[in-house]
Amino acid sequence: MLYVNKPLAILHANCQGEPLVHALLASPEFRRAFAPRVYLNYARQQIPQVDLDACGLFLYQHLGSEWGELASATLLARLPERCPALCIPNMFFRGMWPLWSGAPGFDYRDTLLDHLIDLGLPGKDVLHVYLHTPLAAKYDLAALLDETIALERARQARTPVQYLDFVLEHFRQRPLFHTVNHPSAELIAHAAAGILRELDLAPANPHALAALRTGYEEFFLPIHPQAAQFYGLAYGGENTQYPVYGRTRSFAEYAAAYVACRQAGEHNFIGYLQAAQGSTQ
């Protein structure tokens, strides 16, 4: 897309940045006013000073001082004096996946699966125990939901763009996240609407938003059926089929692939799932 004689709108964001740009461009006023450019914060992409000098709008997910030259305060100090800046949401929600862990070394870690695998049990025994252990007896599922809500409220406090109440109102009726940090198109559109309001720009065209895709659609992190039941979800039952990198899997099939990958000594679970696209694995 070619932009001529438009100030840059820099988005310093994670993987949510690209779909947010598409949602913002659905606003005719935003599209006329700015040439958006995304710099991925988690990839530590450097923003050239020439781009900061040409910046007419800086949208950023907050990064603390531990990020050094990419810290939000540092980047804000490098902007032109009158450049408007807005802290935007960095949306995360573990609610549907209480056993999720961000521990390094494997994709989409599950604390109970990892514990059972690390005990050295045979794969079929790992799966049997995992699928039939009463989660509500072993874990305080209500407290785990409260924990992720509290963490997200603290993160949301950095931005005037509110989204958590929307999540809490609707997440039981329909999926608003594909994974813990991959929001649905509906939630991306909700965040974009809040950004446009803060900037006093015209809202997005509803017809354009109806076609919005996030780029996350190829994978939905399967939900443990017991978690779905405990939290009263209208989705995520035992027979639910999930998109998993080119094929569909039930939760039990996904868990079996997790166990097989880990017991094979593989660390790239995403690659493992992608390679299984055309197989019976």
Where are these regions (language model features)?
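Extracellular glycan-modifying ectodomains
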Residues: 1-281
